[in-house]
Amino acid sequence: MSKKFLTILAGLLLVVSSFFLSVSPAAAANATVKMGSDSGALVFEPSTVTIKAGEEVKWVNNKLSPHNIVFAADGVDADTAAKLSHKGLAFAAGESFTSTFTEPGTYTYYCEPHRGAGMVGKVVVE
């Protein structure tokens, strides 16, 4: 192999490898909760998630819409509960909501249309 070929090859490898170092992956939710089970039950799956302060939870509409997430004001102040809540209804499969939790504590939430059916969950923030 010629010296020129090796120099070009080394340069190409350097350029290509720099792309992998400079591209950061998109931030993902630290926990994902299905709104409605795969079998169609009116539940959050899992019903309790544990995360660290500063992390986020993503709720994804799975089955039997519409769903939303409303945080109860017990154990957290009403302003925080309102900021974390997503009262708009998700109708389409795959539609999602995300909330970031900055303070440690236990946060209870429910699906407004299905609360009476027991669609309630918890986020524990350490």
Curated annotation (Swiss-Prot):
UniProt entry tagged with the keyword Nucleus: no
Induction context: By copper.
Membrane topology according to the record: Peripheral membrane protein
One Pfam family this sequence matches: Copper-bind
UniProt xrefs under Gene3D superfamilies: Cupredoxins - blue copper proteins
Required cofactor(s): Cu(2+)
Homology family: Belongs to the plastocyanin family.
Name of this chain's protein: Plastocyanin
Organism from which the protein derives: Synechocystis sp. (strain ATCC 27184 / PCC 6803 / Kazusa)
Recorded name of the encoding gene: petE
